[in-house]
Amino acid sequence: ETGIVKGSVDGPKEIDGYLKKNEKTNQVTVLKANELCREDKDALPIRTQYRPLCSDGRHTLLEVKLITGRSHQIRAHLASIGHPIAGDYKYGDPAVNREARDKYAVQSQMLHAWRLVMPKELREPLAGLGGREFTAKPPEEFMRMAAGMPGYERFIS
């Protein structure tokens, strides 16, 4: 996945934590990895890898890889380390979202699954998809925002 986040991001890095979901609000909280979380059956372990691709100093285009796959994981995990996804109205920064909307006409979160690689060994009925790769171009609003970052075209087009 690729995402456009707030700030200049150092990396690459791997981050860990625990995710706890509030069913009433459909929102998750990221907790630091500690003994208390390990004992809480509702706190699920999460691990996310990311690598900055390019930046304009105010925003960074990241490549993100889920090691665990939890609902809202990328959005909440990046927000918890101070780099929320632009256009994310649930976990994002209101000022960043406002700028993305006003300057780049962003209407949704700047998170894009550009490539999906299927595992080689799959059972029926998906066996025929084993080893295949699927790609999708980013939406126009994603491209508009990314275009402000020097070198973005090396990573997305």
Predicted regions and their residues:
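RNA pseudouridine synthases
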Residues: 1-157
